[in-house]
């Protein structure tokens, strides 16, 4: 496998053919903000928060899906990028109904963390207040579509890891939302295994456990990469107890 040498923020780095700019950046502790990306799941490139500049073009590229080429010069933290990222977080805030003070993941929310990172203290755009539904029909979990940012982590983890494909996307524009099966109540879904993976990978309070209080729920998202790695390496080995 060939090795590529390219530059990020003035420093030279090596990458294996097929690695993304984001993968190389994270390997070397270079911070590039993300929201839809989650290690272990397929890359989607929807949130656009990981946009980077590449010398020789005025176009911005998502670091999660862009592969470096030999001699490429990448910039990750310019004033232009900071402006774009702040605007993206503002738009996400204005398109949903994000009331942090009463959210179960207040203090543990990736969107909230991004707002701090980009220095967001107010939203310049008019709030749209879309009419979204809350589905509490599942015995263990709730989906509040008001807090959904359409990162589709839930769709991908359910399809790629659990292989149930309960979740999908319906609608257009501001009316776009996550649905269960053929747009039915989550609690009536025959596909759902109640594994909770979708709840764990959700970056906001859109998916949460029943009974969770304000600011109480902390989501563990790192387990996905371990499941995927173990499956790839065929490490699912059960050691039988001695008395069996």
Language-model regions: role of each:
Residues 48, 57-191, 200, 205-244:
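Fe-S ferredoxin-like electron-transfer domains
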Residues 9, 17, 44, 172, ...:
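Short glycine-rich loop/turn motifs that provide flexible caps or phosphate-binding loops at active sites
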Residues 11, 43, 188-191:
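Short, conserved secondary-structure segments in the cores of folded domains
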Residues 13-70:
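N-terminal cofactor/phosphate-binding cores enriched in small/glycine residues
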Residues 1-11:
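Eukaryote-biased recognition of intrinsically disordered, low-complexity regulatory segments
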């Amino acid at each position: 496998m060939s090795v590529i040498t390219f530059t990020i923020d003035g420093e030279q780095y090596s990458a294996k053919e097929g690695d993304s700019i984001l993968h190389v950046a994270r390997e070397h502790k270079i911070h590039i903000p993300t929201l839809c990306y989650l290690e272990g799941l397929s890359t989607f490139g929807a949130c656009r928060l990981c946009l980077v500049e590449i010398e020789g073009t005025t176009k911005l590229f998502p670091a999660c899906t862009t592969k470096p080429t030999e001699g490429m010069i990448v910039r990750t933290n310019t004033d232009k990028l900071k402006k774009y990222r702040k605007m993206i977080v503002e738009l996400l805030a204005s398109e949903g109904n994000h009331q942090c003070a009463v959210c179960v993941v207040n203090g543990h929310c990736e969107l909230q963390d991004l707002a701090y990172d980009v220095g967001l203290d107010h939203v310049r755009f008019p709030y749209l207040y879309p009419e979204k539904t809350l589905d509490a029909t599942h015995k263990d979990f709730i989906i509040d579509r008001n807090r959904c940012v359409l990162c589709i982590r839930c769709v991908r983890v359910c399809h790629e890891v659990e292989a149930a494909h309960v979740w999908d996307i319906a609608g257009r524009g501001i009316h776009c939302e996550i649905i269960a099966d053929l747009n039915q109540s989550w609690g009536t879904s025959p596909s759902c295994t109640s594994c909770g993976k979708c709840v764990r990978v959700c970056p906001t309070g859109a998916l949460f456990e029943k009974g969770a209080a304000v600011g109480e729920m902390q989501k563990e998202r790192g387990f996905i990469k371990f499941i995927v790695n173990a499956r790839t390496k065929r490490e699912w080995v059960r050691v039988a107890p001695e008395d069996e």
